[in-house]
UniProtKB/Swiss-Prot annotation:
It holds the Pfam family GTP_EFTU. Its EC number is 3.6.5.n1. It is an enzyme of class 3 (hydrolase). GO terms for cellular component: plasma membrane. HAMAP family: LepA (MF_00071). It comes from Sodalis glossinidius (strain morsitans). This is Elongation factor 4.
Length: 599
């Protein structure tokens, strides 16, 4: 056990975690030259295309140190995006140490800080690594100083490497083995194994990634899931090297995979503890704190026949992604679907894309909203995650919106722009600290403003240098109203939005104009209105297509022309009474772009 090292790689987006993982695998001979590919751990097509890591992946490597000892390295490559920070905290729970990778050109960014603090809270040994030293813009000394000033860990002898060229990678391995402590645990104690992650395999059923904290797990053992008490057989187990390799036994301190022929996707929840049926452990291992979704949106299958397939797909995905929340929902405009909760807009995009790709579904997404706390007139508190569930205005005492605490790190040159943006987003400044040329800003901004387009706007006002980390702070009373959209006098529940009363007329006006561009013209006029309660605040009309009925008249009497026009008018009127308006998918997402073009 003293030769096992469990560690994660944590960093901000694009600081080179996945590339460093590739080099470690290559140096330790996990894959042959032929099998090596760039970002070998980003196994999902989606991850490759976007160049981001979405799922944490684990690998077991054997490292022969210069002193002749052979060490077993179990490491987990983690995502860097703020939407996937729960993946990082789960990975860290299985480790004794973490490599904090910092780009020697960019320096410390907000996610570097957030992930590093998560690791420190869990008492992990943090080893700083300065990556990308081959870049012309790299300034390792300045960045090492930044790590000390901002993060507060000693970085004087931080390992310097370039994952792309492979320079300094052996030093990283040496430092790992030296600084990260071996796992603690008792091989003779009753088995306690923590489930770090699970996913669904069409042939094997549920595959779980486990970290053995105490005891040992052998093939064929009867195991018990501690939260549900269900018993299963350990049919197959092994490690990833990144290929799946079968083993007979997983020893204390190791990380490996396990298949127990679990068909029910909720049979072994992530964060649960496994133990042996014949010699159970007394207590459960501390799991993970449940993450609360920040953004809610309705997902509906385009054809109602896909509803069952959609439900199964969501079940399988939620097994792999513990933070996905979903419940059935029905909409008068879109039929049956699910209300889903996500951690952020990127998470929502990724889930929708995975559903459409991996499960071959066609989906319509409604505009994302956040969750509101409503105090009704009879003094009960309800939580509302969809505008259509909001009680009528006369039944509401207080409407409280969620406020996020946003930590931003940015160069001083962009401070003015960023402060202007935060004020425009109804933000309140709570803190500002200067670290050399960097400024750390803390603002409290309503979650609805952060979730929609704050990140994109922050990047564009600071030319990509500012970075953001945010979390839910509290609910606060606010003057919010629901803006309904009526099409030909009928309310479309899927298009409603909740916004601040001061912004409602502008938002309504813009949204209506946007819809007018998106809805195709029909044989009759389509009236699009935005309303607060019964008060119409904006209107626009999609003009009808009409045939020129006078074309065959040439000259002729004016009463003849009037008769033809009158006849056409009556026909259009009849058509309007029975005509349905088909809304394109873009119409439901137009709400996201409201307020972007005008600035």
């Amino acid at each position: 056990m003293k030769n096992i090292r469990n560690f994660s790689i944590i960093a901000h987006i694009d600081h080179g975690k996945s590339t460093l993982s590739d080099r470690l695998i290559q140096t330790c001979g996990g894959l042959s030259e032929r099998e090596m590919a760039a970002q070998v751990l980003d196994s999902m097509d989606l991850e490759r295309e976007r160049g981001i890591t979405i799922k944490a992946q684990s690998v077991t490597l054997d490292y022969k140190a210069p002193d002749g000892q052979v060490y077993q390295l179990n490491f987990i490559d983690t995502p860097g995006h703020v939407d996937f920070s729960y993946e990082v905290s789960r990975s860290l729970a299985a480790c004794e140490g973490a490599l904090l990778v910092v780009d020697a050109g960019q320096g410390v960014e907000a996610q570097t800080l957030a992930n590093c603090y998560t690791a420190m809270e869990m008492d992990l040994e943090v080893v700083p690594v300065l990556n990308k030293i081959d870049l012309p813009a790299a300034d390792p000394d300045r960045v090492a100083q930044e790590i000390e000033d901002i993060v507060g860990i000693d970085a004087t002898d931080a390992v310097r490497c370039s994952a792309k060229t492979g320079v300094g990678v052996p030093d990283v391995l040496e430092r790992l083995v030296r600084d990260i402590p071996p796992p603690e645990g008792d091989p003779a104690a009753p088995l306690q194994a923590l489930i770090i992650d699970s996913w669904f395999d069409n042939y094997l059923g549920v595959v779980s990634l486990v970290r053995i904290k105490n005891g040992t797990l052998r093939k064929g053992d009867k195991i018990k899931v501690m939260s549900t008490g269900q018993l299963y057989n350990a049919d197959r187990l092994g490690i990833f090297t990144p290929k799946r390799i079968d083993r007979e036994v997983l020893n204390c301190g190791e990380v490996g995979w396990l298949v127990c022929a679990i068909k029910d996707i909720h049979g072994a929840p992530v964060g649960d503890t496994l133990t042996l049926a014949r010699q159970p452990a007394d207590k459960v291992l501390p799991g993970f704190k449940k993450v609360k979704p920040q953004v809610y949106a309705g997902l509906f299958p385009v054809s109602s026949d896909d509803y069952e397939a959609f439900r199964d797909a969501l079940g399988k995905l939620s097994l792999n992604d513990a933070s996905l929340f979903y419940e059935p929902e029905s909409s008068t405009a879109l039929g049956f679907g699910f209300r889903c909760g996500f951690l952020g807009l990127l998470h929502m995009e990724i889930i929708q894309e995975r559903l459409e790709r991996e499960y071959d579904l066609d989906l319509i997404t409604t505009a994302p909203t956040v969750i509101y706390e409503v105090l009704t007139t009879d003094n009960t508190t309800v939580y509302v995650d969809s505008p259509s569930k909001l009680p009528p205005l006369n039944g509401i005492n207080e409407l409280r919106e969620p406020v996020a605490e946003c930590h931003m790190l940015l160069p001083q040159a962009y401070l003015g722009n960023v402060i202007t943006l935060c004020i425009e987003k109804r933000g309140v400044q709570t803190n500002m600290v200067y670290h050399g040329s960097q400024v750390a800003l803390t603002y409290e901004i309503p979650m609805v403003e952060v979730v929609l387009d704050f990140f994109d706007r922050l990047k564009s006002t600071s030319r990509g240098y500012a970075s953001l980390d945010y979390g839910f702070k509290r609910f606060q009373n606010s003057d919010m109203v629901r803006v309904d959209v009526l099409i030909n006098g009928e309310r479309v529940d899927a298009l409603a939005l909740i916004t601040h009363r001061d912004n409602a007329p502008y938002r309504g006006r813009e949204f209506v104009d946007k819809l007018q561009e998106l809805i195709p013209r029909q044989q009759f006029d389509i009236a699009i209105q935005a309303a607060i309660g019964n008060h119409i605040i904006a209107r626009s009309t999609v003009k009808q297509l009409r045939k020129n009925v006078l074309a065959k008249c040439y000259g002729g009497d004016v009463s003849r022309k009037k008769k033809l026009l009158q006849k056409q008018k009556e026909g259009k009127k009849r058509m309007k009474q029975v005509g349905n308006v088909e809304l394109p998918q873009e119409a439901f997402l137009a709400i996201l772009h409201v307020g972007k073009d005008s600035k």
